[in-house]
Amino acid sequence: MKFNVIVVCLLLNCAVAVAQPAGVALDTITVRHVDFQGQTQQGVLICNKTRAKDLREIFDELYKAKYPIERVRPISEYGDDDERSMRANNTSCYCYRPIAGSKKLSKHAQGLAIDINPLYNPCVRRQKDGTLLIQPATGKPYADRKKPFKYKITSRDLCYRLFIEHGFRWGGSWRTLKDYQHFEK
């Protein structure tokens, strides 16, 4: 696969080099969000240009509703390490990587997917030996969706409703695995 290397200048006084698959148009957008302390923050998402308008509209509605999102930073600030970003409960879109346990590229590799508050909304997969693989590993306390806890995305949640209204699919409704943090379109 061919790559173009682009430099994305962020509004937060930093520059990030991003390996971008040839033919994929990425955009850098700034979104306001309310953090877990109730403070307004400026977040940065690198996403596919075809998703930028939807994401701006969704984040605007989440912000107006004071929906808590701990942090929104490019994955490059975590050394392009998805697990590290998820452990920090970082909401992000673009990450050039395959689907976990596969050679097939993730929707994140094209900026077509977003993970919201991933620590509290882990990806849960039952392995062939019957054990659960939970990502991030530190999200284990939040894998049991029957337990009550803050920041949990459910089908009754505002975040869920907004993404669905914009035509996204939720990983929490998948059959083979449950990726509660994940929305893609």
Predicted regions and their residues:
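Active-site acidic/histidine clusters and adjacent loop/turn architecture
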Residues: 23-86
